[in-house]
UniProtKB/Swiss-Prot annotation:
<feature type="repeat" description="PbH1 6">
    <location>
        <begin position="299"/>
        <end position="344"/>
    </location>
</feature>
<dbReference type="InterPro" id="IPR050434">
    <property type="entry name" value="Glycosyl_hydrlase_28"/>
</dbReference>
<keyword id="KW-0865">Zymogen</keyword>
<keyword id="KW-0961">Cell wall biogenesis/degradation</keyword>
<feature type="active site">
    <location>
        <position position="221"/>
    </location>
</feature>
<keyword id="KW-0732">Signal</keyword>
<comment type="function">
    <text>Involved in maceration and soft-rotting of plant tissue. Hydrolyzes the 1,4-alpha glycosidic bonds of de-esterified pectate in the smooth region of the plant cell wall.</text>
</comment>
<keyword id="KW-0378">Hydrolase</keyword>
<keyword id="KW-0677">Repeat</keyword>
<comment type="similarity">
    <text>Belongs to the glycosyl hydrolase 28 family.</text>
</comment>
<dbReference type="InterPro" id="IPR006626">
    <property type="entry name" value="PbH1"/>
</dbReference>
<dbReference type="GO" id="GO:0071555">
    <property type="term" value="P:cell wall organization"/>
</dbReference>
<keyword id="KW-0964">Secreted</keyword>
<feature type="repeat" description="PbH1 2">
    <location>
        <begin position="185"/>
        <end position="206"/>
    </location>
</feature>
<keyword id="KW-1015">Disulfide bond</keyword>
<keyword id="KW-0326">Glycosidase</keyword>
<feature type="disulfide bond">
    <location>
        <begin position="201"/>
        <end position="217"/>
    </location>
</feature>
Amino acid sequence: MHFLQNAFVAATMGAAPAAATPLEKRSCTFTSASAAKSGKSSCSTITFDNIAVPAGETLDLTGLKKGTTVIFEGETTFGYKEWKGPLISMSGTDITVKQASGAKINCDGARWWDGKGSNGGKTKPKFFQAHKLDESSITGLKIYNTPVQGFSILADHLTITDVTIDDSAGTSKGHNTDAFDIGQSTYITIDGATVYNQDDCLAINSGEHITFTNGYCDGGHGLSIGSIGGRSDNTVNDVTISNSKVVNSQNGVRIKTIYGKTGTVENVKFEDITLSDISKYGIVVEQDYENGSPTGTPTNGVKVEDITFKKVTGSVKSSGTDIYILCGSGRCSNWTWSGVDVTGGKKSSKCKNVPSGASCSD
């Protein structure tokens, strides 16, 4: 499930900065996306003051100077156009991204929402492309109503802290509004995220040394590993998803792999996860996805081993299923299963190749 022509003001002295050496410290305030694109390399601190990004353009913050700080002030908005985006793209090393008190990034996704997401209808822009944003941090952003996917992460040593993505206005027509999609990344930490959306709160398609903790996920598809298989990188290793709540969502926690494809999911921990009002599956592991949907027939190409479900507890709606495990023969192994207590839904009679220690009837 997977992302500038006028005013430029130098904040400190009121004059536009000259070309900067790595040792120079210059603070720049931009009020247009075009000025930011042309002037970003001259600034060690970049402030966006109520910036309105024109329709069909990306707020281009790629190739920032090492050590740059980016601050969003006021309300950041985007013009309407049917296009793929992203609305914001950022890359660089040792970049600090934060938001001033009271500021917000308003994508106004309702202009694109048509109930089809990225599967048809209007072409919708993805929100934030964090590719090659390495050894960096994003803190405190408040983001509203992404048209489709939120953060596309392909980075090393990126920490995202206390970010809110509020797509709650899209309950009716929002679709594919994944909050955090991670691929080909290492040492990613997402701490304290608050998400209201209509798709995965977290989706890890590949990567290693990834932590998601202290999260709150409301309205979407839950906390997901996958789908795994069919990409250039099909390995997920050393992931911890912990101390989080998933409410009013389709799934609680899940691992899904692609029918007939190969890959590896290993050393994944789901710990201290609280579920509430889950409509489909509390815990789900499926090795049968094809063309985005389950087939009911698992295949053996992806191994799912050294998986921990510890203190995953809470409620599923009566129309849903507490736990569903559908593994290929011998492909799910060495699982740790403790303190799991998911209730309220049905007990599945269709589980297959459940590894020792796990259970579809807990």
